[in-house]
Amino acid sequence: MEYLNYSAVVIGSGISGQYAAIKLSEKLDNAKILLVTKSGLGESNSRYAQGGIVGVMEENKSDSVASHISDTLNAGAGLCDFNTVRYISEKSNEVIHDLMHEGVEFDKDENGQLLFTLEGAHSVRRIMHCNGDATGRGIEKRLTKISSSSNNIEVLENTIAVELLCRDRECLGCILFDGKNYQIALSHVVILAAGGIGQLYKNTTNPVCATGDGIALAYSAGAELRDLEFVQFHPTALAVDGANKNFLISEAVRGEGAKLVNEKGVPFMKKYHELEDLAPRDVVSRANFEEMKLAGKDYVYLDATKLGVEKIEKHFPTISLMCKNNGINMAQDFIPVHPAAHYFMGGVKANIDGRTSVKGLYVIGENASTGLQGANRLASNSLLECVVTAYSLADYVKEHQNNEVIEADEFIKNKLKKYYQELGFIEYDTDALKTELQNIMWNGAGIIRNEQGLKQAENELVNLKSKFLRKDVCANIQEYEFKNMLTVSQLIVASALKRKESRGAHYREDFPNTKDVSEHNCMLKEQGELSFVR
């Protein structure tokens, strides 16, 4: 077997992963970057991000760093890290201009000036878009073109990372699996940019690859995790059956004036929050959930008819087309919507340059907890966090570059041996197992939680785990995904049980009030067991 050394190994090919790979390939001496993706290059949560990217831009005279900090802290409900928020806000102008230098094209007006839009809980227009409502796809398409043509970036598609190689709390590489064969990639810089956890829930706006792999890998490696109870449910996913189920109806539609209404066409958000339809997402999701219960239906409606045909076609071409494909005319018809798991505020505890509690292990993007998002992410802050942390990571690694070759000693070689043992003849229906897990999480650890529901979810997950006998080694990529989903689900439920209050996206109907003092839930794996730490 060949044991190859790399300047950096990046696991995940969304915006944070690809941007980190590109910046590292540009900044490191004799760069040799390995970019690993579980599906095809560019298939990620980032690709489906419609709303846009936040930036406090020098071109936008009505905005300021102070204003963006204030909005982010208000949405974060006491759990944001002020220094992280300030750094990312201050850095946004530089990094977004670098994206533009790399060839990303943001929407502009007829005078060639950047267009800024408004979204929920933002006090000013500061969100930028690519092609109206295809921002994630626009950014990722350009980054994919760069990374796939770079001589310094090797891309491995349809390959999953199954274990991080750690010794004495230092990460030295990872074990990869392409569905048939295993291989080891060695590096002093291993970057997890593996995305979110949406597939843990029955309803989600996330693609099928969002199975919490990065968080499960980091947990198994002993890295500290933080605030895993905070799952953001987007209020407006398209409530239709079939291939378009849970397609995201961007918050930007409400930012331009659309209203949530009941089946009689009556707006209802005024009775839930002073900001009405532009209230923080947790508030709007719970409001939708309550209205659905009142009406005895699985959806409410979004009324975008007052926006008019011209604005709809200009700003929301993707959403408009998706609605038309489902027999809905946005300019004339109400859109059936319901909440769906959308974004994970929790994750691996990391600095703004991706460093974690394990030397050599870096985490960026949605699987990281940097302190920007707090208990409830501000709309469109996620793509900003992806690019700023990737950019800062590349700067840090350049400054501390270690070119020493990692030798494949007996410790490393022995790590691989277990993966070639016979597994026996057990075959698992992973689709059925995933569906069972998704229902458990939706019912017990979803939008509105309580002790009884969480305890029931905890017990049901233990029972589900007893049906799945794989421990370290699995037969295929789908089994590895399910193993990761099970691990992260149990961690989320444990963290949700520990937080006996309601804060941000975590709502406990048995503890509806927010404590005066905000505290993080931090956890790690010690002696093979979950341990909460301060």
Residues of each region from the PLM?
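Conserved N-terminal glycine-rich FAD pyrophosphate-binding loop of Rossmann-like flavoproteins
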Residues: 39-73, 77, 232, 243, ...
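N-terminal Rossmann-fold NAD(P) dinucleotide-binding loop
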Residues: 17
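An anion/pyrophosphate-binding glycine-rich loop and adjacent beta-alpha core
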Residues: 217, 223-329, 387, 396-402
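Short beta-strand to alpha-helix junction loop
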Residues: 80-93, 127-145, 156, 204-212, ...
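Conserved redox-cofactor binding core of oxidoreductases
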Residues: 101-181, 193, 237-240, 260
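Glycine- and aromatic-enriched mobile tails/lids
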Residues: 1-7, 20, 27, 32, ...
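FAD-site-proximal beta/loop scaffold in flavoenzymes
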Residues: 163-177, 184, 328-370
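Short hydrophobic core segments
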Residues: 9-11, 185-194
